[in-house]
A protein has these predicted regions:
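A short acidic Gly-Thr/Ser loop motif
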Residues: 10-16, 81-82, 201, 208-215, ...
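Nucleotide/phosphate-binding catalytic cleft detector across ATP-hydrolyzing
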Residues: 1-16, 20-76, 81-206, 263, ...
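Phosphate/pyrophosphate-binding loops at sites that engage ATP/ADP/AMP, CoA/4′-phosphopantetheine
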Residues: 63-75, 302, 306-320
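Glycine-rich phosphate-binding/hydrolytic loop that grips phosphoryl groups
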Residues: 350-403
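Glycine-rich phosphate-binding loops at beta-strand->alpha-helix junctions
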Residues: 318-341
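Boundary/linker segments of alpha-helical solenoid repeat arrays
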Residues: 486-496
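Phosphate-binding glycine-rich/basic clefts of nucleotide- and phosphate-handling proteins
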Residues: 68-69, 83, 157, 162-173, ...
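Residue-level signature of catalytic and energy-coupling elements of molecular machines
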Residues: 9-10, 19, 79, 172, ...
Length: 524
């Protein structure tokens, strides 16, 4: 049975890369159609690709597994960006207007675009979260329609090292598979928050902590706005490695952690110092030693979480408390440990999202929440070619086949394996051709987007030069902007050009003399 109009999402986790295909239903739920995963320990570190070849192989394998279940080729995917180096920084953009002007959405968009253009060495701005706008002496979140001659936009820029995004796109190009156009800046912690947090929690103020294998991500919300985001390079794997330091194999260390580990243990006076935890004679460790190792590392992670909450400046404003998610929350007593260490009393364990799922059974332990969130964020149909509806394909027969050594050969001497190989090659070439066409379209759109950004930059430079009374230079910038032939910018260019001409005339010697004589005549 084939599936059409489905969405495919892939999560690049530190322990495994997982792909999922699902279909959005009219009632708002998602029907999960297929799921596949590959080990990521040798290609993903701290949530970031470090071995491109192995990541490409894993992605290729996952795509093939999903296609095998769906019976349809996959043309594009949604991949979230997360991991170490992802964080937020504050930025402010100011605009001085010539006179009292009603703020338009176009002006707000221009200010927001300007903050995206702020250069940060070695980093790339993946997203911008507006905080508030200072209009006059007032702070507002929705300034459109307000009259003012001065506006100050305060933003939170979401940044990451340039290779974070570049490596994802490079691996997808090698597969080859296209990244969906509207997934260009799909940031995993943001879509996770949309899927896990309630509107009330975002509004009242909360911290979302995602305990992963190699990283712990902290996201803080207040008044429905992202206020702080940071990725701590510590996770569940650090606990496992600490246990390994006791001459224990990694697989056994993970088993000991899951079977006997606790994030918090109430102190006891009569602790048995000789108590031992054992995996059926395979390996063993002193119970108190294991408890101390786990508790020490958990406390280190929680101290870093608390530090990020403090750095945000919102530690006393989180009325909805903390929401914990991710595979790490399955460590026993994690909720108690979090409360004891951070002093945050209100804690919710989010082992599943707010999204209703149907179809294939999905783990409800917090480990798949980001994957489900990425699937829910998808909008485009990810199938490569839609098959003919309901029309069954005729059964193919080998004509004039001859039996030779147990195999069927066609009259031209090809074996079934060779026929299948040729068909597979043909399908691959068709897929690559479609991918190349889609890539060309995307590059054209990106080029157009870049042209518009350059035009907007020229306009802003012209406005600045106009304000500095450098009218000749301002006109040169406007002529360059006009020569780019961008229809939606023509009106703005003409308006500024007219304003420059009027100001130039007004401030010329002739203009000043005319104004002088007019003043004298008015006085007479």
């Amino acid at each position: 049975m084939t599936a059409t109009d489905f969405i495919v999402a892939i999560e690049l986790g530190s322990s495994k890369i997982t792909g999922i295909a699902g279909k959005k239903l009219p009632d708002g739920s998602i029907q999960v159609l297929a799921m596949a995963s590959e080990n990521a320990s040798d290609c993903i570190r701290k949530g970031v690709i470090y071995n491109l070849d192995k990541t490409t192989l894993s992605l290729t394998s996952i795509i093939k597994k999903l296609e095998s279940i769906l019976k349809v080729s996959i043309g594009k995917v949604y991949i979230g960006m997360g991991g170490q180096s992802l964080r937020t920084i504050r930025n402010t953009e100011v605009r001085h207007l010539e006179e009292e002007t009603k703020i338009s959405q176009e002006l707000i968009d221009t200010i927001k675009d300007s903050t995206r253009g702020v250069p940060i060495v070695g980093y790339q701005i993946l997203g911008v979260a507006p905080q508030e706008y200072k209009v006059g002496n007032d702070l507002v979140t929705e300034p459109v329609g307000v009259q003012t001659d001065h506006i100050e936009g305060r933003f939170l820029n979401i940044i990451a090292r340039k290779n974070l995004k570049e490596n994802i796109y490079q691996c997808c190009e090698y597969v080859p598979i296209e990244v969906a156009e509207d997934a260009d800046d799909l940031i995993s912690p943001l879509v996770l928050a949309d899927a896990v947090l309630t509107n009330s929690e975002k509004r009242s103020g909360c911290v979302l902590v995602d305990f992963g294998a190699d990283t712990t991500t902290v996201s803080i919300y207040k008044n429905n706005i992202l206020r702080h985001l940071a990725v701590i390079p510590l996770g569940g794997n650090n606990i496992t490695k600490d246990i390994c330091s006791q001459q224990i194999e990694e697989e056994d260390a993970e088993a000991l952690k899951q079977q006997f580990g606790q994030a918090y243990i109430e102190p006891k006076e009569d602790d048995d110092e000789n108590k031992v935890y054992s995996l059926g004679g395979k390996c063993s460790i002193n119970a108190i030693l294991l408890e101390d190792i786990i508790e020490a590392r958990v406390n280190e992670i929680l101290d870093n979480v608390l530090n990020q909450i403090s750095l945000s400046g919102y530690e006393n404003k989180l009325l909805a408390g903390a929401i914990l998610t991710g595979g790490g929350i399955n460590l026993k007593n994690m909720e108690v440990a979090f409360t004891k260490r951070t002093k945050i009393e209100k804690v919710r364990m989010a082992k599943e999202t707010q999204i209703t799922l149907k179809g294939i059974e999905i783990k409800k332990d917090g480990s798949t929440n980001t994957l489900i969130a990425l699937l829910a964020a998808g909008k485009e149909d990810c199938s490569l070619v839609k098959p003919e509806p309901t029309k069954p394909e005729p059964v193919k027969k080998l004509s004039s086949a001859t039996v030779i050594e147990g195999q069927l050969f066609t009259t031209d001497g090809r074996s079934p394996a060779e026929v299948e190989e040729e068909e597979e090659l043909k399908r691959k070439m068709e897929k690559e051709a479609i991918f190349a066409e889609q890539k060309a379209k995307k590059e054209a759109l990106e080029a157009e987007k870049k042209r518009k950004a350059e035009c907007e930059e020229l306009i802003q430079e012209a406005v600045q030069l106009k304000n500095e009374e450098k009218y000749g230079e301002a006109m040169k910038k406007l002529k360059r902007a006009s020569a780019m032939n961008i229809p939606e910018k023509e009106e703005a260019i003409n308006a500024i050009e007219q304003e420059v001409k009027e100001l130039k005339e007004k401030n010329s010697i002739t203009g000043k003399l005319a104004k002088f004589f007019t003043t004298i005549l008015d006085e007479d």
